Amino acid sequence: MGGVSGGDYILETHRLTKKFRGFVAVYDVSLRVRRGSIHALIGPNGAGKTTVFNLITKFLPPTGGKIFFNGIDITQEKPAQTARRGVIRSFQISAVFPHLTVLENVRIGLQRSLGTSFHFWKSEKTLSVLNDRAMELLEAVDLAPFASVTTVELPYGRKRALEIATTLAMNPELMLLDEPTQGMGHEDVGRIVELIRKVSVNRTVLMVEHNLSVVADLSDTITVMQRGSILAEGSYTEVSKNPQVLEAYVGTADE
């Protein structure tokens, strides 16, 4: 098996399967994510994409199959163990603290990465050592001018940028982005696309995304899922010409 050697592939799944009381959500999925690439997972609603994310990040145990990260079998690990290895997921629903400032949200991400999670009672002086790094991350996602803004007041697209900043604070080697442009207007989509391109330098990104123009713009490799299994894989040019892929998307009005 290639998974035991790591090498060019940062993440590999071998025949990954998940069943819920007889319903097969994911079946026989063998995925290989090349180190340093942007890899998109696409498919109609109910194709199993989010379940695959949940399996990779250990929010669900697999019914069968194996998961390798950097050549190490992580199939039985707890979510926190896998996160410590550098597999970090940005959630589809904006996972930020709405009543804290933008800076404080990123600082919490830094605290998590240092193992001082949620010590809100620590003195401001103690926490201020994290501020410089937090500001660097905010600058990376063009949020430095919003540092002192209460998060609830941020526009939606900026909240998604903040979510990416808090994910970066966890120092991901493999960054999983779940629907990063969902619910955005055209201008915000463009901003997030450029942001993903920027933060993907020297790291690997695996993303679930419905917006096919975003997928075409960003992805090195695309895996198309349908009914829990892999239907096709390749570049955007390759998969967009695949008759099975075209058929899978016909009639899915929300795609």
Protein language model features and the residues they cover:
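Glycine-rich phosphate-binding loops of nucleotide-dependent enzymes
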Residues: G2-E255
